[in-house]
Amino acid sequence: MSTPTQLQPPASPTYILRGHASPIHGLHIFHQNLRLISGDADGWIIVWDLVFKRPVAVWKAHEGAILEVKGFTFSNQTVTEVYTHGRDHKLCVWRFRAQDEDLLQKTLPVDISEQNQSQATQPWLVHSLPVNALNFCAFSMLFLDEEESPDTGEPEASDKTSTQSPGKNPPQHHSLFAVPNALNSGAIDIFHLPRERRLCTIPADQTTQTGMVMAVTLFYSSTRELYIASAYEDGHVMVFALRGQLTTQDFSGKASSDSWKWERVYVARAHSQPALSIDVFPAGGYFVSSSADALVVKHPVPGFGEVGTVKKVDTKHSGQQGVRIRSDGRVFATAGWDSRVRVYSCKTLRELAVLKWHKEGCYTVAFADVEGSFDSGGGATGDGDGAQVTKSGEFSLATVRRQRNQKVQKTHWLAAGSKDGKISLWDIY
């Protein structure tokens, strides 16, 4: 007799983070996988410590819903910068130092009252840039190389920026941002920070009524040429390339927007319904799109080595958004309106896992970095004492802290945010 195949039990989340009182719209794992940042439909931001699963900072960043949120650490991991995009038509940059964390509010939105909100201490608002937020398309950002960054001895910033920046001579991290154009919802604007200046506009396609821009992604080629992938309301996806490397002249006030010559290098009607999200894996020369229809499509990026072919799969499950490719390019995940998170193979597009826990639709997912080399000293949690090396056999608090950090950093986290306001953390693949 043949032995019946034993079915593996369904996957279950490792942790559930409960803190938001409204749907989760943005997630990002950063700080060497030690921090998770989340944003919700009421404009609240929470920075979570993934070691202790507790909030590090909580504040209301926008009066409207959060469209996207990103977090980064600088200055030997002692300074955190948070980039938020809200439905109040603002793109904000927030900053706090490791020594400020004890002073920041930690009361979660589900527990907060209006009185506590008025007395709350929030991070420094470094920049507030007016941008379009009418069509639910979140920003995409790209840090510039040092040789591309203009000299901003006197950066153009708001008065609020100059009075609230923590520390003396805070570092200026030059970056580009792509957002939909304010006048033509099918066009794309490129902004520069810290100059807070619009550099150019990629006009809407004149031959096709694509409708609104639904998603954008900025990325570099191997030769450091700037590319942007975009997805549209009618199901089209496109890729534009800016030929030649960027120079400081391109960011100076003397350069006009006409000096930015964009070339459309790829266009495809990939979906029958609005394309909801895209993500690019430059090292592999491809990007993935998901839509309100049931298709998941893998597209080649012309100019990235050998040009591949378009691959698509009918998943039988409509409404998958928030697509994210993991840093090693092996798997990607989508957030489903049916409350499921699905994990696919980047190579074959085969469905590898269906993660079911949430009772309501999921809107966003985030992967941990599985390829980075991490320094798990105490400085990663804002305490420099843990960076010291203990002798063999010596037991100390620093050793325990370092071991905890290493365990979290090496975990293949997948975070999912749902309409129910909860964040599920999964350890997969």
Swiss-Prot record:
Chief localization: nucleus
A GO BP entry: chromatin organization
Subcellular location: Nucleus
SMART domains: WD40
PROSITE patterns linked to this entry: WD_REPEATS_1 (PS00678), WD_REPEATS_2 (PS50082), WD_REPEATS_REGION (PS50294)
Name of the molecule in the record: ASTRA-associated protein 1
One of the Pfam families matching this protein, by short name: WD40
Organism: Aspergillus flavus (strain ATCC 200026 / FGSC A1120 / IAM 13836 / NRRL 3357 / JCM 12722 / SRRC 167)
Assembly information from the UniProt record: Component of the ASTRA chromatin remodeling machinery complex.
Gene name of this polypeptide: asa1
Keyword annotations from UniProtKB, A to Z: Chromatin regulator, Nucleus, Repeat, WD repeat
Chain's role: Component of the ASTRA complex involved in chromatin remodeling.
Superkingdom of source: Eukaryota
One GO CC term on file: nucleus
Keyword Repeat: yes
Nucleotide-binding among keywords: no
Family: Belongs to the WD repeat ASA1 family.
Region (Disordered), start-end ranges: 148-176
WD repeat ranges, renumbered to this chain: 19-58, 64-104, 208-250, 270-314, 315-354, 392-429
